[in-house]
Regions:
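RNase H-like DDE/DDD metal-dependent nuclease/strand-transfer catalytic core used by mobile genetic elements
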Residues: 5-6, 23-47, 53-151
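Residue-level recognition of single "structural anchor" positions
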Residues: 16-24, 33, 65, 86, ...
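Basic, flexible linker segments flanking DNA-binding modules
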Residues: 1-31, 36, 103, 176-185
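C-terminal, beta-rich DNA-binding module of retroviral/retroelements integrases
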Residues: 160, 164-223
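Residues at helix-coil transition
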Residues: 2, 79, 164-165
């Protein structure tokens, strides 16, 4: 390390894992797509899951025909349970922007005063709770394959209710998550539009680049 042969990034990979847990409900939600699988009608299912970090309460587990449409799922969750302080996800293209820029989803979260957080690349332990949730889902729910997307929605909804209200959790003193979770006191609201002053107008293309003559500068896809 003294000779510059070991990078800080490489050193960080080998640090001992540190468990974390927020001290109250809705301080952090974890979200991720469960790996897709084949349904009985040969279509593919991409379950999107949202988990409260403190209580392990499953906010949403929603089977989808594609790894997209996350804003609608979160919007329904915000309407039912209120707003979290932050949302932790991996660096998948649905959640994380290109070259450090922001996605439309991240911009929307920030407009709602929600901090988007991303785990370290190739370090799934950061989202250990939702990874463990996915293992439980695979063991208890996906032992039998749903017939189609509608059948998947029914089975996922039933299993989610059992997981939240009946299934005891060791980290909660053998209580089910529903006995610990409380909805957020922050209700969903409509963000105020930005009011920009007068000045030079420059167009940002669909890929987030701003052009000055022959020079291209990357800003963000949300501009």
């Amino acid at each position: 390390k003294r000779n510059g042969c070991i990078s800080p990034e490489e050193s960080q990979k080998h640090q001992p894992y540190q468990c974390f847990e927020r001290d109250r409900c809705n301080a952090l939600w974890q979200t991720d797509f469960k790996g897709d699988f084949l349904l009985g009608d040969s279509s593919r299912c991409f379950p999107l899951d949202i988990l409260d970090d403190r209580s392990r309460f499953c906010i949403r587990t929603e089977p989808k025909p594609a790894a997209s449409g996350i804003k609608e799922t979160f919007l329904n969750a915000f309407r039912e349970y209120g707003l979290p302080d932050s949302v932790l996800s991996d660096n998948g293209s649905q959640f994380s922007g290109f070259r450090g820029g922001y996605t439309q989803f991240e911009r929307w979260l920030m407009d709602l005063d929600i901090l988007p957080i991303h785990g370290r690349i190739r370090h799934p332990q950061t989202q250990g709770k939702i990874e463990r949730f996915h293992r439980t889902m695979k063991l208890e729910l996906l032992r039998t394959v749903p017939n189609d997307m509608e059948d998947a929605r029914v089975k996922f909804a039933l299993w989610r209710w059992k997981y939240n209200h009946i299934r005891p959790h060791a980290a909660l003193g053998m209580k089910p998550p529903a006995q610990v979770y409380e909805p957020s006191s922050r209700a969903l609201f409509v963000p105020k539009p930005y009011d920009y002053g007068s000045g030079m107008v420059r167009k940002v293309n669909n890929w987030g680049y701003l052009r000055f003559g022959p020079v291209r500068v990357y800003l963000s896809e949300t501009m």
